[in-house]
C-alpha cells in the first residue's frame, strides 16, 4: 500500500508515461519501502516500520488532505511541470495533481501549499533522518504581493 508519493514530471507527458524528473514513493512493505527515482534511475531504501508510522501520523494530523479535489487546476498550456501527490494514513487515501503550482506571479493555491508543507514535514522529520535523498523543496515558494500600479510616475 502506498503511504506517500510525491512526483514531478513534465506537463506535456501523457499521464501513463514512465518518465518523471523526480518521484518518491513510500509503501507499507517491510523491505525496500522507500523508492526514489531521479531522471528514471531507481534507488531502493528500507526504513523501519516505526518511521512509516511517523509518516502516517503526520498525514493523519493533516486530515484536510483527504478533502482535496483530484485536480488542483487544469493545464491550459502544456508547459512546465505537473506535481502529483498521494497521501494515506492507513485508512484513508487521496491522490491529486496540479500544474505549475510553484510558479511566481500566479495566485497561491491553498491545497498545493498544504500538500507541499506536509511533504516537506515528512522529508525533514523522517526521510532526511534516515538518509533518503529527495528533491522535495525545503522552502516553499513565496509569491510576491500584488501591488496596484500607481498613476503617479516619479522621475
What positions do the PLM features span?
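Short, well-ordered, aromatic-rich surface patches in folded extracellular/luminal domains
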Residues: 1-14, 67-155
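Alpha-helical scaffold elements adjacent to nucleotide-binding pockets in ATP/GTP-utilizing enzyme cores
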Residues: 4, 26-28
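Short, solvent-exposed loop/hinge segments that bridge or flank secondary-structure elements
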Residues: 13-26
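Short beta-strand segments
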Residues: 22-24, 43-45, 92-97
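A short, structured loop/turn motif at beta-sheet edges
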Residues: 28-30, 47-54, 87-93
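Acidic/histidine-rich, surface-exposed loop or edge segments in extracytoplasmic proteins
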Residues: 29-43
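A short, polar/proline- and glycine-enriched secondary-structure boundary/capping micro-motif
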Residues: 42-49, 105-109
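Charged, amphipathic alpha-helical segments
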Residues: 48-75
Amino acid at each position: 500500500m502506498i503511504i506517500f508519493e510525491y512526483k514531478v514530471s513534465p506537463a506535456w507527458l501523457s499521464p501513463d508515461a514512465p518518465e518523471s524528473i523526480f518521484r518518491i514513493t513510500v509503501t507499507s512493505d517491510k523491505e525496500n519501502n522507500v523508492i526514489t527515482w531521479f531522471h528514471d534511475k531507481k534507488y531502493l531504501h528500507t526504513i523501519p516500520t516505526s518511521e512509516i508510522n511517523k509518516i502516517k501520523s503526520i498525514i493523519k494530523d493533516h486530515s484536510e488532505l483527504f478533502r482535496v479535489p483530484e485536480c488542483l487546476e487544469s493545464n491550459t498550456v502544456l508547459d512546465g511541470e505537473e506535481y502529483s501527490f498521494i497521501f494515506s494514513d492507513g485508512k484513508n487515501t487521496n491522490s491529486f495533481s496540479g500544474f505549475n503550482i510553484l510558479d511566481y506571479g500566479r495566485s497561491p493555491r491553498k491545497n498545493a501549499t498544504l500538500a507541499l508543507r506536509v511533504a516537506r514535514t515528512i522529508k525533514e522529520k523522517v526521510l532526511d533522518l534516515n538518509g533518503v535523498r529527495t528533491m522535495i523543496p525545503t522552502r516553499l515558494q513565496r509569491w510576491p504581493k500584488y501591488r496596484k500600479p500607481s498613476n503617479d510616475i516619479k522621475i
